[in-house]
Regions:
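Active-site recognition of the HExxH zinc-binding catalytic motif
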Residues: 81, 182-199, 250
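Generic beta-strand structural signal
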Residues: 137-138, 164-166, 184
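Metalloprotease/metallohydrolase-associated module, dominated by Zn2+-dependent proteases
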Residues: 2-10, 116-128, 146-156, 160-162, ...
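Conserved aromatic-histidine-acidic binding/catalytic patches
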Residues: 19, 76, 80, 105, ...
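Hydrophobic (often cysteine-bearing) scaffold residues that line and stabilize catalytic clefts
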Residues: 28, 180-184, 246
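N-terminal low-structure segments adjacent to metalloprotease catalytic domains
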Residues: 1-134, 200-220, 271-285
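Short, His- and charge-rich active-site/binding loops that engage polyanionic ligands
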Residues: 134-146, 151
Length: 285
C-alpha cells in the first residue's frame, strides 16, 4: 500500500510533469490564436483586404458532370488561373452541399440549376475569407415569375432573411446568366442583396471590409453632388438603382461584373470602392 507521503509526492510529480505543462500549452495556444485574430483584423482595417482568403488543403470536388457544367456555363471560372479554379470548384461544391435546393410548382431541380446558381454566389464572394452566407440556407426555384401573396405582385427573385432563403425564377435567372453584357442579371442582383444583408449582420473580416467599403462609397457620393448628377445623367446604371441603398449596391454589382471596363472608365472611384469591398482581384477585374 502506498503511504500518504508517497501518494502526495506522486500527485505533485503528476501535476508538475504533465498537468502544468499541458495547461501552459493550452493557454499559450489560446493567446496565440487571439493575437493572430487581432493581427488579421488590424491588417484588414489597414489594407482593406484579408490577410488570406483561400484554403489550400482538403478541397472538395464536384462530380464530373457538375464540373463540365461549371466549365461550360461560367466564363468567369474559365478565366481564372488553375489554382483559383480549384478554389472556385471547392466553394461551389460547399454551396451545393450546405444549402437545400427546392423546386417550386413541380419544378425538378437539376445539376445545371445547382451548379449555375452556386457558381454565381461563389463568384461574388470569391474574394471573401468567410464566403458562406449565414442568411441563406435554402434556394427556392420557380419555373418562371411567381405571384407573391404578401404584396400581391409577381416576382422574379428575392431574399427572405426570415426564412433564410433566396428565391429565383429559373427562366429569368437563366436569361440574365446567358446574356453577359447587358447589366441585367437576376442571380447577381439577388446574391448582391444577400451579401449586403449578410455583411450588415456579421463582424467577420470580410464583412468588416465590405461594410467599411460601402460606408466609403456612400460618403463619397454624399459629398460629391456632381458625381451623383453624372450617375443619373449617364444612364449607365438603370433607374432602379436609386430606389434605396440595397438596390443601389445590387445594380452597381450587376454592372461591375458584366461591364467592368466601362464601369471603370466612367466612374473610376466607384469601381475602386466596389473592387475593394469584394476584394476582387481576379480575371480581368
Amino acid at each position: 500500500m502506498v503511504s500518504k507521503t508517497e501518494q502526495e509526492i506522486f500527485e505533485m510529480g503528476l501535476i508538475s510533469n504533465y498537468i502544468v505543462p499541458i495547461g501552459i500549452i493550452v493557454i499559450g495556444v489560446f493567446v496565440l490564436y487571439r493575437l493572430i485574430k487581432i493581427f488579421q483584423y488590424s491588417y484588414a482595417s489597414i489594407y482593406k483586404k484579408p490577410l488570406f482568403a483561400q484554403r489550400y488543403f482538403m478541397l472538395n470536388n464536384l462530380t464530373r458532370a457538375q464540373y463540365e457544367i461549371l466549365k461550360n456555363e461560367h466564363s468567369f471560372f474559365r478565366d481564372l488561373s488553375r489554382k483559383d479554379q480549384l478554389q472556385f470548384e471547392h466553394r461551389v461544391s460547399k454551396f451545393i452541399q450546405t444549402n437545400t435546393f427546392v423546386g417550386k410548382q413541380d419544378l425538378v431541380v437539376t445539376d445545371e440549376m445547382k451548379v449555375t446558381i452556386a457558381a454565381t454566389a461563389t463568384m461574388l464572394s470569391f474574394g471573401f475569407k468567410k464566403y458562406q452566407l449565414d442568411i441563406v440556407e435554402t434556394v427556392m426555384i420557380y419555373p418562371n415569375a411567381y405571384y407573391s401573396q404578401i404584396n400581391k405582385k409577381f416576382h422574379k427573385g428575392e431574399v427572405n432573411p426570415r426564412l433564410k432563403a433566396i428565391v429565383f425564377s429559373w427562366e429569368d435567372f437563366k436569361h440574365g446568366h446567358n446574356i453577359e453584357d447587358d447589366n441585367l442579371n437576376l442571380g447577381i442582383h439577388e446574391f448582391g442583396h444577400a451579401i449586403h444583408l449578410n455583411a450588415s449582420k456579421n463582424n467577420d473580416i470580410s464583412s468588416l471590409i465590405f461594410n467599411q467599403g460601402f460606408n466609403k462609397l456612400t460618403t463619397y457620393l454624399q459629398s460629391n453632388e456632381s458625381v451623383r448628377q453624372n450617375l443619373i445623367a449617364s444612364k449607365y446604371f438603370r433607374a432602379y438603382a436609386y430606389t434605396n441603398q440595397y438596390e443601389f449596391f445590387a445594380v452597381l454589382l450587376e454592372n461591375f461584373i458584366e461591364t467592368p471596363s466601362e464601369f471603370q472608365s466612367q466612374f473610376p472611384e466607384l469601381y475602386k470602392c466596389m473592387k475593394q469591398m469584394l476584394n476582387f482581384k481576379f480575371a480581368s477585374y
